[in-house]
Amino acid sequence: MMENQNEGVYVTLSELLRFGYMPKNFTIRPSAAVLSKLSGRHLSGVRGRGMDFSEMKQYVQGDDTRNIDWKATRRTGKPYVRIYNEERDRNVWLVISQMNSMFFGSKERMKSVSAAHTAALFAFKALETGDRVGAVVYNNEEVKFFKASSSKNNVVQIMTEIERQNHLLKADNTNNSKGNLSESLKILSSLAKHDDLVVLIGDARAMDEGSARHITRINAHNDVIGVII
């Protein structure tokens, strides 16, 4: 009964782990920085490349017609197809806010709950695609860091920390500081080296000049997705 009363207000570990069994009809292979907006569990605006372009060759029977390069075909008068190499696995870094400003929402769920759901969705999608998952979970007072790993147990630990910080949220908490987004990004800027994916999950309250500088530095050699709750 108590769990039903708290549904949408607080998350549970079992609730987050269920995302591992849900269909995830999106890609985490963006070709450029993407700013997405998420409501509940529905993600939009994330477009992926999936494969890296390698070379062009003349079409032969059996080639995938979806890869025909129509510009080259028109120019030469002969059908040409683009050849792709599958991308390597990479680190997917989740930066999850459980700040006091996230303890607000609609009748359906709190923003803090939506952020937790989003993190679970991305984490299990990354595992499905063979990527490694790391995370920084932060609130107004603390930052918890998890190294990137392809282990499901690592994701369970991340979800456990999200649940813990989520249950610290209270309506009467008066700490309205900017939180630890800048500190979280500072940690990541030294870890996300090249071709990693960084997913920022939260509201805009924690953003400041320091955070913006770190994001610019990270985005120079990595992909960054912002999920605004």
Model-derived segments and their meaning:
Residues 52:
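Detector for the canonical C2H2 zinc-finger "Cys2" submotif
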Residues 2-45, 58-63, 72, 81-117, ...:
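Exposed, interaction-prone extracellular/peripheral surfaces
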Residues 65-67:
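N-terminal juxtadomain amphipathic helix
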